[in-house]
Amino acid sequence: MKVLLGLRLARIAVHLLFGLASLTPQQFRVLTMVCEGLLNKQIAYELSVSEATIKAHVTAIFRKLGVRTRTQAALLLQQLESISQH
């Protein structure tokens, strides 16, 4: 059972790593800001871009990570960070 759980976690980590590796530097910045709880409008202001640009980045991030919500994206990033600490 522990082996299966370990394999499942490894598969999740690999999927996340590929998803994260496919993000552009700007998309990764947006992802970290999303995970900090910032709204699209706030992120746009901080990065000096339009809110529409941020919406496009968020859509691309969700597609690449295979998630549908900001909460799911934040949880995936937290899971990856906790796996990498072990």
Task: Give, region by region, the residue ranges found by the protein language model.
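C-terminal output helix
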Residues: 1-4, 46
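Regulatory hinge/linker segments at domain boundaries
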Residues: 4-33, 86
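Basic, Lys/Arg-enriched C-terminal extension of HTH/homeodomain DNA-binding domains
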Residues: 5-7, 17, 63-86
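Intrinsic low-complexity/disordered segments
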Residues: 12, 23-24, 54, 69, ...
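Generic serine detector
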Residues: 22, 48-50, 82-84
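A cross-family signal for key residues in well-ordered alpha-helices
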Residues: 31-32, 45, 75
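Short helix-to-turn junction characteristic of helix-turn-helix DNA-binding domains
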Residues: 34-38, 77
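Recognition helix of helix-turn-helix DNA-binding domains
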Residues: 37-72
